[in-house]
């Protein structure tokens, strides 16, 4: 697994994909109505940013319980993000279909990363 050879969290494929997803979310949400700037836009962006941020935190954490907590937060943010995308679609805030496959890929990679990291002794 790449995590064994990674020296920084930026070298992790799961972090790289999550970061690319955040950039896509920012671009997508730029087109939300101004009235959403402090609500859905903010919620969507915070949930998206939480994914790579939690992966980065888990990378440096040495305690397994802390690693598990960080990765669980990231996984929860994936699910929250899915809901926000559904809500944005239902509110008519543009087409986000290109984001769904990215989010699914991040979720799958995160699941595999969590299994490997939590099965590894440090």
PLM features: what roles do these ranges have?
Residues 1-122:
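Amphipathic alpha-helical assembly/interaction segments
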């Amino acid at each position: 697994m790449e995590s064994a050879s990674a020296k920084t969290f930026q070298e992790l494929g799961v972090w790289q994909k999550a970061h690319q997803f955040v950039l896509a979310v920012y671009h997508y949400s730029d087109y939300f109505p101004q009235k959403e700037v402090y609500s859905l836009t903010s919620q969507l962006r915070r949930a998206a940013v939480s994914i790579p941020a939690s992966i980065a935190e888990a990378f440096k954490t040495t305690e397994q319980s802390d690693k598990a907590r960080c990765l669980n937060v990231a996984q929860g943010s994936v699910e929250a993000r899915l809901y926000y995308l559904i809500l944005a679609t239902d509110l008519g805030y543009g087409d986000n279909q290109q984001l769904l496959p990215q989010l699914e890929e991040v979720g799958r990679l995160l699941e595999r990363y969590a299994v490997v990291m939590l099965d590894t002794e440090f």
